[in-house]
Amino acid sequence: MTSAAPILEIDRLKTYFRTAHGPVKAVDDISLSLGPGETLGVVGESGSGKSVTALTILRLLPEASAHIEAGKIVFLGRDLVHLPKKEIQKVRGRMISMIFQEPGTSLNPVFTVAQQVGEAIKLGGEHSPTKVREKTLQLLQEVGIRDPERIMGSYPHQVSGGQKQRVMIAIALSCDPKILIADEPTTALDVTVQAQILDLLRKLRDERQMSILFISHDLGVISEIADHVAVMYRGKVVETGSVLDIFRNPKHPYTKGLLACRPRLAGDTRRLLTVSDFMEVRKNGDSIEIIEKQVPATRLAELQSRGRERLLSPRGELTKLGITLPASNATFVPEDQSPILRVENLEVHFPIKKGVFRRTVGEVKAVNGVSFNVYKGQTLGLVGESGCGKTTTGRAILRLVPITSGKVEFEGKNFLGLRGEELRTARRRIQVIFQDPYSSLNPRLTVETALTGPMKTHGVGKNQADRRDRAAATLEECGLLTEHLGRYPHEFSGGQRQRICIARALAVEPEFVICDESVSALDVSVQAQVLNLLKDLQDDRGLTYIFISHDLGVVKFMSDMMAVMNGGKIVEFGPSDEIYRNPNNDYTRKLIAAIPDDSLSSIDRRQQLRQLHA
């Protein structure tokens, strides 16, 4: 943090996209400044203009469809808007570098890590093969990659998501830039890897005296790294301030909504507040009017406490497992009630094949002796990092992957032994909502076909007209409109697509739904809406869920019971509130510690440490 002159100043910038329906004002008259060695956090939902702002700084937008309508971008005394192409190319990478959200698609799959980092070093003017290799090794060590010699010879698909992002950071640092633009660099990562990347960026910023423009949709992440914050909404900056001021005293209703919609580990929140609880938006021709809702704090607290208590497994079952019973705020399943789903000693092993003849040389125990019960109306949360076995467990229950051994009983029947019509009937009653709403909907099918197709397969509805009526009713239940039936997936936002996926799962009237990372691809504000919807549907329809996620905060909010998975095993099991209050396993404690801490005391402490080391 510094009081020196800004290294980057954006003054009244306007970036528009040309469309058949007129210009889209993606960035609409914004002004920002970034000081030397400072981190500016830019936060907002998808479509707010934050990423377009970053791309505009480096003039990376396609000239055929986008143009800078007005404004200045002054970097070290030069206006980047009017620089010739050759001059702006000297700025890109060398003076201002950028890392993107998805490291898997940012790296070229046909080149090794060494080749890709080396190429960036050569662009900076170093051409000696020996020196390029030495600097590549040094950069990989600097960004915290273990065994950098091995990683240098690896291809992107051979390294983890966290390692890929570290490689991207190494590439960005290769020419010693003054500014690093980090566009959602942790969104695609597990919470523990996210914490490591944030630590790394802080360390690099301080050691290199580098400025960072950090873009995110999550104010919790912003609180961990930023000195100042700019909140963007519909192309405009609606609020700016120090990170402590923004969290302590937010002025704009949109900022208040973003702060309120994140699931918190502390407390017993049964319903998440959303941006719409704080403001409404009216469109008057081309202008947008934001009206703040003056909702008393007591009313907001009442909204958060609305909903049923936790539904815990029978007391006797928990006592046998040695689990501490909570004092209040919970209802127990009756002792004589049988589970709707029973999983016993589930094993899923995948063969490791090598050589020309693809001989099996070993196996990966993706799921290794997993057992649990789920009772009707309950939500069991499966939480853990990527590779822990949680998604494979869900897919094994659905019989989407081969099971090595174990039992899966649904309503007392051996689900693994079902065949023919019995299996078809059971599959109608167990549905799944996948992680990515973009890839789980067929782009060639209308919403109506996506919903009525499964109904026809499972014999739901008398005829096509009846199925269409049912689809329309289900869409409305999920917060969409009947007229959406005739549209295609590309015409919807990410949150709307996930609502369509939920409606598709519910269209065949299931009793049990497996939600596999079903909100991890969404902005936190949209995530809150979808989580509330899932809870409402559970209450209205009496649904039972298995809720899979890497985010302990989300799982705690959604779940009655929680199973923490690591290395294919359940390492901790119990009531979700109790696991947060009193975790018994080191891995669980690690997951909890990795969640961004946006309490005022923690933000204040981080800022004081920054002041001391400035």
List each language-model region with its residue ranges:
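Conserved ABC ATPase "signature" region
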Residues: 79, 131-150, 414, 465-483, ...
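Conserved ABC transporter NBD signature motif
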Residues: 68-79, 406-414
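ABC ATPase NBD coupling module
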Residues: 80-97, 123, 245-250, 356-361, ...
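ABC ATPase "signature
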Residues: 237-241, 570-574, 582
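Conserved signature/switch motifs of ABC ATPase nucleotide-binding domains
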Residues: 93, 157, 175, 490, ...
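A short, proline-enriched helix->beta-strand linker immediately N-terminal to the Walker B motif
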Residues: 174-178, 507-511, 527
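Short catalytic/signature loops enriched in Gly
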Residues: 4-6, 146-149, 243-340, 353-358, ...
